Amino acid sequence: MQDQTARGYGEFAKGWPVVFSAMLGIGLGLSPLPFYTVGLMAKPLVKAFGWGYGQIFFGVTITSMVVPLASPVIGFLAERFGVRRVALTSLFLFSLSFMAFAFSSGSLALFYVNWAAVALFGAGTLPITWTRAVNNYFDVRKGLALGLSLLGTGVFGYVGTWFTAWLIEHYGWRAAYVGVGALPMLIALPVAFFAFHDVGGVGQTGAERKVSDAA
């Protein structure tokens, strides 16, 4: 029992940067940001372009359609290049594509294309990418580590909603898209760049990574 406790402390001593960067990456990724902010953005978009609420929220449906198509590609890229490269690239492109909403001109077609781009480029920020590395770092405290990683969804869902409302009220919806979209690039990306690393080499299974790390 004491040995397991010591191993658990050792895991967190080594792996807490991965957990922290995963929490930020998930919390500022595709899972929460578009879905928690679309309701706040809908009213100013209706006022600006005369769109219906149903037309605006259809963007969420597009995201739900694109993600299942993009997920196998993300999985292949993660196997080929490693989850670190996939996560960092996806954070950067997701941030840019989300900020691109600020340039909406009233074309619903382009608005929907933007939603598709957000889903496509942001698929690598979904929890499966981050939790793969967390899963490989932890054994004894794996459940706790995964739980802490997923904590970011709720935390940044709340913070993102408040921040979006504040930006809309003080600077308008275009600035809100830029401000919220910049969060992954300015917060999650730098932390992940320095702290998010997978165990072992690219293309290894989780068991192989543990063996190579212990050798």
Segment roles from a protein language model:
Residues G27-L28, S97, L108-T125:
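Hydrophobic core of transmembrane alpha-helices in multi-pass small-molecule transporters
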Residues Y36, S64-P72, G157-Y158:
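Residue-level signature of mid-helix packing/kink "hotspots" within the transmembrane helices
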Residues A175-F194:
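Symmetry-related core transmembrane helices of the 12-TM Major Facilitator Superfamily/SLC fold
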Residues L45, G124-F138, L146:
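Intracellular juxtamembrane helix-capping segments at the cytosolic ends
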Residues F92-G106:
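C-terminal ends and interior cores of transmembrane alpha-helices
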Residues D139-T161:
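Glycine-rich segments within core transmembrane alpha-helices of 12-TM secondary carriers
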Residues L69-V83:
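Helix-to-loop junctions at the C-terminal end of transmembrane segments
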